[in-house]
Amino acid sequence: MSNIIFKKGNIFSSDKQTIVNTINCVGVMGKGVALGFRLRYPEMYEKYKEFCKNKQITIGKLWLYKRPQEDSKWVLNFPTKFHWKYPSKMEYLEAGLQKFVETYQEKGITSIAFPLLGTHNGGLDKIDVLNIMHFYLDKCSIPIEIYEYDPKAPDELYKQFKDKWMSMSIYDKKNLGIRTNQIVVIDKIINDINNSSMASLSECNGIGIITLQKCFNLILNYKEQPMLDWK
């Protein structure tokens, strides 16, 4: 029986010990799942920008980020492209997958959730990527999930945010530094029954990165003292 399970949904809902964040080598996390990681792990994002500035993020080099809290997930940052403007390449995926297979045990990774590498914003074919991921990951002896990105999949963080936001007065919302017109937009999103994830906020016109971070800060504790582990 295969140790790999394919899912379509929200990778942040995974119960696996480690989740994979696909990154470029120039310090940008501006779209899709990467933006979700940026907002959930702002300390990691700041370190990532610093590492990119110092040319420490390269293809085939994996960066394992750990929060000190025992119940926090680890994040494996996996470069799938050099620049965010350019497409991913299969050889980039293979370099990272080979490194993962060689090092996951010594790094203490006991279960992991991958996205379909390089397919959402990287432009690679889903079937080709799934085949190459199976080729390498079938060699591992740990539970593995592979997620196809679905921005509409339910997100527990969204429910927490919605409950918190709806309990706040307009005065409290303004005290967060969110402008009145942005509050109106967020209220509209919150009241739309078709929205069920934080991605619905990030994809809405009129809501910028700074406002998104303020929304995430409502429900996340960012007092991090991260441990960094290079592969």
Question: How should these model regions be labeled?
Answer:
Residues 1-231:
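Macrodomain-like recognition of ADP-ribose-binding/processing modules
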